[in-house]
């Protein structure tokens, strides 16, 4: 599952005819859930228009109500250039066979960033660092960029400290939430998709015990999924012994 970014990358004009300073914010939603996609979002705005974002009640998406996130999602899309990469569970599982989640995230972050750098390399990129070391994350991120001279501000809690990253956080969160709502139309109540959510745990356990397999919306590489499948196998052995 993916959104418009691939077409936009292929069809984008490599020059926007301007070298005015631009600001880009990057963040993700859905890194830890056992159900559903991980969404990587970027938000770009001309530096001269950054004050417009500062006038909004932007903060980390988790600190906002669903209604407020939806309202801001519309405003941000109207005000900024927004791009998203939606990585579905199957793709996450395949990539996790060869790389870890941090590298999956880094790859998506760099893909979005290079899209903007091709248009204008006079750019500052603000990004929520997804590893324990901000410097290590920044170095790995920069290594994937087509221009190593762009300014990178990679920090923990950047979604709380910089409005441009808060905006990306909101875009990512709302996009993922909408996918989860689509899932509910097919599967019924599934909760938030996080392993700690009682509704998610109940749905997943019931589904696995009824179908003897995981739903396609589950990340099979997650410990929660593996443990459930192990329970099924052990229950089969127990019934055979009886």
From Swiss-Prot:
Residues 21-234 form the RNase H type-2 domain. It catalyses: Endonucleolytic cleavage to 5'-phosphomonoester. InterPro entries: RNase_H2_suA, RNase_HII/HIII, RNase_HII/HIII_dom, RNase_HII_arc, RNase_HII_hlx-loop-hlx_cap_dom, RNaseH-like_sf, RNaseH_sf. Its EC number is 3.1.26.4. It comes from the Archaea. It is an enzyme of class 3 (hydrolase). One of its GO terms (biological process) is DNA replication, removal of RNA primer. Manganese or magnesium. Binds 1 divalent metal ion per monomer in the absence of substrate. May bind a second metal ion after substrate binding. One of its GO terms (molecular function) is manganese ion binding. GO terms for cellular component: cytoplasm; ribonuclease H2 complex. It is found in: Cytoplasm. PROSITE patterns: RNASE_H_2. Its main location: cytoplasm. A divalent metal cation binds at residues 27-28, 128. Its cofactor is Mn(2+); Mg(2+). Keywords: Cytoplasm, Endonuclease, Hydrolase, Manganese, Metal-binding, Nuclease. Endonuclease that specifically degrades the RNA of RNA-DNA hybrids. Belongs to the RNase HII family. This is Ribonuclease HII.
């Amino acid at each position: 599952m993916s959104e418009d970014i691939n077409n936009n990358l292929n069809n984008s004009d490599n020059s926007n005819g301007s070298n005015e300073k631009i600001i880009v914010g990057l963040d993700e939603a859905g890194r830890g859930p056992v159900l559903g996609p991980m969404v990587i979002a970027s938000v770009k705005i001309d530096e001269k228009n950054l004050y417009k974002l500062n006038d909004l009640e932007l903060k980390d998406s988790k600190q906002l109500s669903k209604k407020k996130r939806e309202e801001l999602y519309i405003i941000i899309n109207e005000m900024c250039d927004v791009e998203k990469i939606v990585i579905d569970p199957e793709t996450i599982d395949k990539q996790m066979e060869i790389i870890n989640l941090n590298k999956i995230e880094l790859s998506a972050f760099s893909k979005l960033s290079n899209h903007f750098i091709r248009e204008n390399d006079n750019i500052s990129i603000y990004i929520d660092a997804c590893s324990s070391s901000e410097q290590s994350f920044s170095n790995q991120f920069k290594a994937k960029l087509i221009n190593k001279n762009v300014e990178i501000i990679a920090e923990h809690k950047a979604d709380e400290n910089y409005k441009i990253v808060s905006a990306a956080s909101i875009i990512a969160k709302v996009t993922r939430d909408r996918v989860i709502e689509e899932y509910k139309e097919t599967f019924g109540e599934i909760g938030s998709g996080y392993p700690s959510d009682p509704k998610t745990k109940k749905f997943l356990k019931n589904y696995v015990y009824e179908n003897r397999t995981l739903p396609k919306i589950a990340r099979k590489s997650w410990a929660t999924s593996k443990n459930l499948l192990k329970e099924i196998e052990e229950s089969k052995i127990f019934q055979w012994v009886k």
